[in-house]
Regions:
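Conserved micro-motifs of the catalytic ATP-binding
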Residues: 3, 28, 77
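ATP-lid-like helix-loop hinge signature
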Residues: 20-49, 105-110
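A residue-level detector for a conserved hydrophobic packing site
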Residues: 8-9
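Conserved glycine-rich
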Residues: 98, 102-105
Length: 152
């Protein structure tokens, strides 16, 4: 499966915008206004090889009832919100066979931020033509393997 970089960029921009608005609404001092974007390759038994993108903010977090409904069409907590951003993000990620989730961050019982993360599976097939051919003894030899997969 190919990843559409424009669509993934759209998801990241939406999550970053939401994080910035959360920090703004929390009226935090400048020293606590942080947003972290991380991109980490991972491998899990459940998901296999994937890339995890995460956006973490130090805003007020999300109430449970918002987390339960935030992907619904036209659901918004913002007075001027259309309620399509997170639903669109989820559709984009799922169209790439990925998953998206949100979680509050805690310091003891207090919510100290929110983290949105999504994963996109990575499929790196190894073309047979890139392997060194076996010689008559069954050894692979000492040649150099070349990746002959076509790139767009």
């Amino acid at each position: 499966m190919r990843v559409d970089p424009i669509l993934i960029e759209q998801v990241l921009l939406n999550l970053l915008k939401n994080a910035a608005e959360a920090i703004d609404n929390a009226a935090l001092p400048p020293s606590r206004r942080h947003i972290e974007l991380r991109v980490v390759p991972k491998h899990t038994a459940e998901l296999g090889a994937n890339i995890e993108f995460s956006v973490t903010d130090m805003g007020p977090g999300l109430p449970v009832e918002v987390i339960e409904r935030m992907y619904e069409a036209f659901f918004s907590t913002k007075a001027d919100g259309l309620g399509i951003g997170l639903g669109l993000c989820r559709s984009i990620i799922e169209s790439h066979q990925g998953r998206i989730r949100a979680e509050n961050l805690y310091n003891g019982p207090s919510i100290v931020g929110c983290r949105f993360a999504f994963t996109i599976p990575v499929d790196i097939p190894r073309p047979e033509s890139s392997l060194a051919p076996l010689d008559k003894s069954g050894d692979a030899g000492t040649g150099t393997a070349h990746n002959t997969a076509a790139t767009p």
